[in-house]
């Protein structure tokens, strides 16, 4: 009951029976060119080469080169990644297709850089016309993350004190959940409070959008018994676990890879159309 009172205090609990979450899935993407591939692992670039799916070791090596060789900063890449995530969400679930106005979104952030991507994503979702709420149970005491929290607070984005304990409560309150808990560098067992959070997410009927890796999945092998997102936003390049993704929408985001780095790792990234920062792989 304390969790319910917290939610009521935020003015987020909506009376009445459960509403349908998505009334239509309107396509906002450009018409697919004739060379567009439909197979998950066989997504083709214009040159005909398959986009490379990275192992955990390869993903870490690419990240380190971006930071060390190319002198990108963490906050710079985080901003670009978070914007890509919000853009992909707006394409898959445009506000006009949702039953609430503005559409309600719960963004669950973990303690690492994936959580930082989620904070940036929430800020851009607010600018795109959504009503995000953030649950951020383990906050790092670092200037980068405290700054991101302040930015969200200044934009009147609420932070939950407790995670709704039952899937039905989340289904009633929100039309979409963004999973920004763990990224590709996560290893080991999932500990509390995130084990309980993932248990709640596994029982949802509203769609889940996972950033880079569905939380709780092995970076290369996936997890058939874990959460099953409807949208996956791969960042920089897809990871091998994405071959096990069975949802409706798979976007590639993070249009910041230097051509020389792409060539070195044979990423075969697609040609993003015009000024787009995301590319639909599936």
Curated annotation (Swiss-Prot):
Domain annotation YjeF N-terminal: ranges: 59-269
Catalytic activity: (6R)-NADHX = (6S)-NADHX; (6R)-NADPHX = (6S)-NADPHX
Keywords tagged on the record: Isomerase, Lipid transport, Metal-binding, Mitochondrion, NAD, NADP, Nucleotide-binding, Phosphoprotein, Potassium, Secreted, Transit peptide, Transport
Transit peptide, residues from-to: 1-53
Post-translational modification as stated in the protein's UniProt record: Undergoes physiological phosphorylation during sperm capacitation, downstream to PKA activation.
Cofactor section: K(+)
EC number(s) stated in the UniProt entry for this protein: 5.1.99.6
One cellular-component annotation, GO: cilium
Tissue expression summary: Detected in testis and sperm (at protein level). Expressed at high levels in heart, liver, kidney, and testis.
Role this protein plays: Catalyzes the epimerization of the S- and R-forms of NAD(P)HX, a damaged form of NAD(P)H that is a result of enzymatic or heat-dependent hydration. This is a prerequisite for the S-specific NAD(P)H-hydrate dehydratase to allow the repair of both epimers of NAD(P)HX. Accelerates cholesterol efflux from endothelial cells to high-density lipoprotein (HDL) and thereby regulates angiogenesis.
NCBIfam families assigned: yjeF_nterm
Family the UniProt entry places it in: Belongs to the NnrE/AIBP family.
Name under which the protein is recorded: NAD(P)H-hydrate epimerase
